[in-house]
A protein has these predicted regions:
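A structural motif corresponding to the C-terminal lobe/cap of the Radical SAM core domain
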Residues: 1-143
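C-terminal non-catalytic accessory extensions
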Residues: 144-148
Length: 148
């Protein structure tokens, strides 16, 4: 995820974006092929949070970048978080993953709705490429001002 605060508070991963960028640069310089997978539609995710993932994706030196819609698997703390927040019912059983189904979560504002999650998933590659071209054209600092 591209938002360090969201990544720390909701996902439980603590690292700065600069470290991720640096790690992918090192791997690429070493001749490794890399894949970066972004998950969209986490519980409590806003569009603003999600756009920070697009921004991060445009800065990563990856061979391949993919996006997937968050799935609330049984037995995970994040699924329990979704049930406790009322984003899904406790009896929901995810038998088969199909991103084209969209999100299982029903989140109120200010969080992403099902349409926003699906649209971001469906267009992530396009947004990432546009962001990369724009960054290269106008410079990274200016892009950060436009996205903020």
């Amino acid at each position: 995820h591209g938002d360090p605060k969201f990544r720390r508070d909701v996902i439980g991963r603590i690292y700065e974006n600069t470290k991720a960028i640096e790690a992918f640069d090192i791997a690429t310089e070493a001749g490794l092929s890399t894949t970066c997978n972004f998950i969209i539609g986490y519980p409590y995710e806003t569009l603003e949070n999600c756009w920070k993932s697009v921004e991060l994706a445009s800065q990563l030196n990856c061979s391949d970048i993919n996006a997937f819609i968050y799935t609330p698997y049984h037995g995970t703390p994040m699924r329990d978080m979704c049930v406790d927040a009322g984003f899904i019912s406790d009896d929901l059983i995810v038998e088969m993953i199909n991103n084209d189904q969209g999100s299982f979560l029903n989140m109120p504002r200010p969080y992403m709705n099902k349409k926003e999650i699906y649209d971001m998933y469906n267009n992530f590659g396009k947004y990432f490429r546009e962001n990369t071209v724009q960054r290269d054209r106008i410079g990274e600092g200016k892009l950060r001002q436009l996205i903020a």
